């Protein structure tokens, strides 16, 4: 089994190898699945998204339009300091962790138990520890980001991973 740091490097490389057309096609498939997921859960009104970096799955315009049409409010992470983050709305107001119905969470790798590997700073693991089990935590990834690894006790287990496949 590969160690987490090697796995991070490998997945960053794999994402970087996607050409624009491949990435656009995969992102479109995933965005369609995200919309289908949200349609089945009409109680989700406050959704935590992320601003994609380093070739993470992007939220496309049709997805963002879907959120507006369905009156789903989106919020985004904002780094507070080297250990903590918060989520803010479009007016830069901090959102209480318990007011978020569902989190769409980026990742570098995931395993069969829905544990994720991120960039290794622990921002999401610490933030999600403030939330309740009722709030959905959904990992967003490409299929090729699946890997077998041993999770650490502090690694947060997600409810579901949504991929292109």
From Swiss-Prot:
Broad class of where this protein is predominantly found: cytoplasm
GO biological process per UniProt: folic acid-containing compound biosynthetic process; tetrahydrofolate interconversion
GO molecular function annotation: 5-formyltetrahydrofolate cyclo-ligase activity; ATP binding; metal ion binding
The enzyme's E.C. designation: 6.3.3.2
Catalytic activity: (6S)-5-formyl-5,6,7,8-tetrahydrofolate + ATP = (6R)-5,10-methenyltetrahydrofolate + ADP + phosphate
Residues bound to substrate: 51, 56
Listed cofactors: Mg(2+)
Alphabetical list of Pfam families matching this protein: 5-FTHF_cyc-lig
GO CC annotation terms, alphabetical: cytoplasm
Localisation: Cytoplasm
Family statement: Belongs to the 5-formyltetrahydrofolate cyclo-ligase family.
Subunit structure of this chain's protein: Monomer or homodimer.
Function: Involved in folate metabolism. Catalyzes the irreversible conversion of 5-formyltetrahydrofolate (5-FTHF) to yield 5,10-methenyltetrahydrofolate.
Listed name of the protein: 5-formyltetrahydrofolate cyclo-ligase
């Amino acid at each position: 089994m590969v160690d987490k740091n090697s796995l991070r490097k490998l997945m960053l490389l794999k994402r970087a190898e996607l050409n624009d057309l491949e990435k656009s096609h995969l992102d479109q498939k995933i965005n369609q699945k995200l919309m289908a997921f949200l349609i089945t859960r009409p109680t989700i009104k406050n959704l935590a998204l992320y601003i994609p970096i380093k070739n993470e799955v992007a939220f496309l315009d049709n997805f963002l339009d879907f959120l507006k049409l369905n009156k789903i409010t989106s919020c985004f992470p904002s780094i507070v300091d080297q250990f903590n983050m918060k989520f803010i709305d479009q007016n830069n107001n901090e959102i209480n962790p318990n007011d978020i119905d569902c989190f769409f969470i980026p990742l570098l790798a995931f395993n069969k138990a829905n544990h994720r590997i991120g960039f290794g700073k622990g921002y999401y693991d610490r933030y999600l520890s403030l939330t309740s089990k009722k709030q959905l935590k959904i990992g967003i990834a490409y299929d090729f980001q699946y890997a077998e690894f041993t999770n650490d006790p502090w690694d947060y287990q997600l409810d579901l991973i949504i991929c292109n496949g």
